[in-house]
Structure formats: C-alpha cells, structure tokens
Amino acid sequence: MDTIAAISTPMGEGAIAIIRLSGPEAVQIADRMYKGPKEKKLVSVDSHTIHYGHIVDARTDQVIEEVMVSVLRAPKTFTREDVIEINCHGGIVTVNKVLQLALREGARLAEPGEFTKRAFLNGRIDLSQAEAVMDLIRAKTDRAMNVAITQMEGRLSGLVQRLRGEILETLAHIEVNIDYPEYDDVEEMTHRVLVEKATSVKKEIESLLSTSHQGKILREGLSTVIIGRPNVGKSSLLNSLVQETKAIVTDIPGTTRDVIEEYVNVRGVPLRLVDTAGIRETEDIVERIGVERSRQVLKEADLILLVLNYSEELSEEDIKLFEAVSGMDIIVIVNKTDLEPKLDVEKVKQLAKDRPVVTTSLLQEKGIDELEMAIQSLFFTGSIESGDLTYVSNTRHIALLQAAKQSIEDALEGIEMDVPIDIVQIDLTRCWEQLGEIIGDAVHESLIDQLFSQFCLGK
C-alpha cells in the first residue's frame, strides 16, 4: 500500500491542528520534513514517542512551522501501519503548507475514511466497529456516544461472532452426520436438538432486533414535529426545548412561515425537532409554501407534539389536526394555562385516547419537565442510561439481522416439515453468511468503498 496523508482536525483557526500520515513510508516522509534538536532523526526514534522540532522545506531551507511529531510504528497503531501525527498550530495556511509538503515528499492525499478503511482491511477492527467510529463522531447525546463506544469496543461483534460460532458448530455436526453416518463417536443431530439450537439462535437475533427501534432513535434522532393552530405557542415550545431563540415569537398568527429544524437532547433522547407553519388554508403565497412543507414533514415524523390553547375553545381546526395524526405517536400539549381557561380538557383527553396529555405555561416556564419525561417514557422504559443493553442502531445491521431471522425461520419450518437435512443446512448457512456481513466477513468491495466514503477526511 502507498502512504496517505490528510488533515485530521476540522479546518479553520484553532490552537492545534493535526496532519496524519499512514503507510510504509510515513516515517521516512516525515523525517525528510522534520528538523529536530541535535540532528535527531525520526527514523531512529522509538515507537510511540513524541518529538519537538520544526517542519522545514528542504528545497528552500525555510522553516514552515514549529511542531510536535508523534511516531507510531506498526502493528500497534490504529491502521496497523506506520503512523505519523504532526501537531502544529491551527490555521488554514500553515496547516495546508505542512500537508502539501507531505504530499510533495511522496504521500498521497487520503480519501474520506481511508484511515479507518485501512484499519478494517488490516484486521484492526471489523466492519461494525468501523461504522461505530462515524456514529461516535456524529453522536448527539451522551447515550448515543455510549452506544457507539460499546460497538467500537466490539460488544455487537462479539455477540454476532458467538451466534455464528453456534451455527457453524451445528453445520459441522450435520455435515459429519451426512458424510460419516457410521461414526459412533459423534452424537446424531436429532430433530429435537436441531430445533433447540435453531430456536436459540432465533431468540438471540430477535433480542438484538428488539433494540433496533430505540437504537435508531439514539443514532439518528427522533423526527419530532410540532403542530397546532397559529399562535398556540409552537415556536415558544421549540425555544423552551432548545433553550435559545431560533423561531420568531410574536402575537401575530402565522409568523412561522417555514419549517425550522433543530437537534435537542431531551433526557438522553435526541430529538430532530421541527417547528412547522400552522397547517391551515391561507392566501399568503409564502405562508402557503410553509404549510405544504409542514404537511410533508408530518408524514415522515416519528413523534407529533400537538399544541392546543388553554384559553380558547376547541376548534374545528384542532379536531382536524387530531384526525390528521390518528394512529401516530403523539403527545398533546395544553399550553397557556396561565390564562383564563376555556378549553374542555376532558374532551381533549377523549380525542387523545390513551396518548399523553401535558399541561404547560411556556410563558411561565411550567410543564417542560413533565413534557420531557413523557417523551422519554413514550420510547424508553426505565433508565435510558442503562449500559446493559447492546443497541442495534445501524440500518444495514438491522436489515441483515432481519434477513438472518428469516433464514433461521426457514430452517425451523423445514425441520418441522421434515425436509431433507441438507436443505435445512442451506438455510442455516445463509443465516451464518448474513450475520457475517454485519462484521464484514465476505462483504463486496463496492459496499466497503461506499460505507467508508461517508466518513470525514482524515479519519
């Protein structure tokens, strides 16, 4: 493999920036750029050491930057290759000069995610662990971060490998029974034993899949739409949850003319919170565009926060909103409880059916805690911070687990129908292969390229 280089820290001004190199010539390339005290040579220093010096353009003898250089030799590195990390002052011009010098000395500019890709290809991590690196970078809450870390540490990989081991052991047992029926040393794979083993695998796959809904919420955020008639307090609710003024809050109905989106951490649940223009008929062209966008995001929502006005009677428009979100996960928020009551709350509870109804006075900052608790309890039972569960959050993993579950169910159905054992063997083998794809066993190269292309440059 050639040697790659990239800036591993965000571009812009900052205290420190890092340029990373990885590959067989990483140390030699850095050595040609580096000038240390007492003629120190990086090619001669020990692994996992850091060295003060300067980056110098050998052609002009110009000092480019004062640096600290980390030397990390294979195989005890992230990529299992020789790795150099040049720590310099943050700044667009200086950092790019150091990178350009590394490229001139023989490195190639890394592709997005190529360092992590090399870690995978060199056996340092499996594919699910590699994907967890990006999940960690993109985590919006502490819990999402913890889920990514447990996956990086190999908890999901370990479970998948154990399941594959159980299936492989069963397949080997079947193979011996088929090819060497005369062997008395090997116990016969009876109908009962085969059902027990396949059922055990199925239950474990189902257990993993049972965490997928919550896992996807933690990974991607809960698409949450705030709806209600104009001027019931939708934008005030958004601002209360975000805790800063993002939407325009006035007494004029219809002020929010577009869709406003913001990520919010609610008791460990990441909400992709959307405040919409009121869904109503309007002659205003700009407002009408906002209303149409509101209808679209409503269809795609995971959670609806339906806001009502405590100081006004329930209107036909309110009832239509209840009808529009029928069958969806909703929390009804009765706002403006600081004003004179006119709303029939019992009627609201009837319309809400068994969905939560929370009373608030956003002006007086009352009811927000109760709303946050309602959101958490709607999607997570017990403490969301529990580290006992292995959450499956990646869409690719979920699809493969669902396919593996179908394969094991096909095997069980075949056993019950008393089909030939070699047919059952095909279904078990397919299940084994599908589980293997989660950790990157026998994955097509184009899929690997596509997955790592989503990473940021320098990772």
Curated annotation (Swiss-Prot):
Record's cofactor remark: Binds 1 potassium ion per subunit.
Enzyme Commission number(s) of this protein: 3.6.-.-
Record SUPFAM superfamilies: P-loop containing nucleoside triphosphate hydrolases
A GO molecular-function descriptor: metal ion binding
GO biological process, one term: tRNA methylation
Binding site for K(+): 231, 250, 252, 255
Residues given in the record as GTP binding sites: 231-236, 250-256, 275-278
A single GO cellular-component term on record: cytosol
Enzyme class, spelled out: hydrolase
Positions bound to (6S)-5-formyl-5,6,7,8-tetrahydrofolate: 20, 85, 124, 459
Annotated localization: Cytoplasm
Main location: cytoplasm
Residue sites binding Mg(2+) per the record: 235, 256
Entries under InterPro entries matching the protein: G_TrmE (IPR031168), GTP-bd (IPR006073), GTP-bd_TrmE_N (IPR018948), GTPase_MnmE (IPR004520), MnmE_dom2 (IPR027368), MnmE_helical (IPR025867), P-loop_NTPase (IPR027417), Small_GTP-bd (IPR005225)
The protein's required cofactors: K(+)
Record keywords: Cytoplasm, GTP-binding, Hydrolase, Magnesium, Metal-binding, Nucleotide-binding, Potassium, tRNA processing
Domain TrmE-type G: 221-380
Coiled-coil parts of chain: none
Domain of life: Bacteria
Similarity-based family: Belongs to the TRAFAC class TrmE-Era-EngA-EngB-Septin-like GTPase superfamily. TrmE GTPase family.
Function of the protein: Exhibits a very high intrinsic GTPase hydrolysis rate. Involved in the addition of a carboxymethylaminomethyl (cmnm) group at the wobble position (U34) of certain tRNAs, forming tRNA-cmnm(5)s(2)U34.
NCBIfam families, per the entry: mnmE_trmE_thdF, PRK05291.1-3, small_GTP
Subunit relationships: Homodimer. Heterotetramer of two MnmE and two MnmG subunits.
Protein name per Swiss-Prot or TrEMBL: tRNA modification GTPase MnmE
Organism: Bacillus pumilus (strain SAFR-032)
